[in-house]
Amino acid sequence: MHEMSIAISIIDAVAAKAEAEHADTVTIVELEVGKVAGVEVESLKFCFSAAAKNTVAEGAELAVCEVEPVGECEACGQRFPVAFHVATCTSCGSFKTNIVSGRELLIKSITIE
């Protein structure tokens, strides 16, 4: 379960930000997680809650915004929604595509007190 290592990394970043701001408590951590990032959101929330014990983030809400995957065609430049990891251009049918969105795992904001 790699979600625990991700949760610990998030807690480390959150704790560093809280320390830099001389804050005692973190109330909300907002994440952007791409739907093809390979992260199970419910597992991440569980792991975050466990990893936050006895830290400034204990009891903090982990708010997750899931980002839909978007592909871009190298042949025609068209952008299109991606249903799976294999993306075929919906405009020209080319297989020369890249996923340009949907793999994110970003801390978007931290609310501290």
From Swiss-Prot:
Pfam families: HypA. The gene is hypA. This is Hydrogenase maturation factor HypA. The keyword Metal-binding applies. Keywords: Metal-binding, Nickel, Zinc. Ni(2+) binds at H2. GO terms for biological process: protein maturation; protein modification process. Disulfide bonds: none annotated. The keyword Phosphoprotein does not apply. It comes from Chlorobium phaeobacteroides (strain BS1). Zn(2+) binds at C73, C76, C89, C92. Involved in the maturation of [NiFe] hydrogenases. Required for nickel insertion into the metal center of the hydrogenase. InterPro entries: Hydgase_Ni_incorp_HypA/HybF_CS, HypA/HybF. HAMAP family: HypA_HybF (MF_00213). Belongs to the HypA/HybF family. PROSITE patterns: HYPA. PANTHER family: HYDROGENASE MATURATION FACTOR HYPA. GO terms for molecular function: nickel cation binding; zinc ion binding. Signal peptide: none annotated.
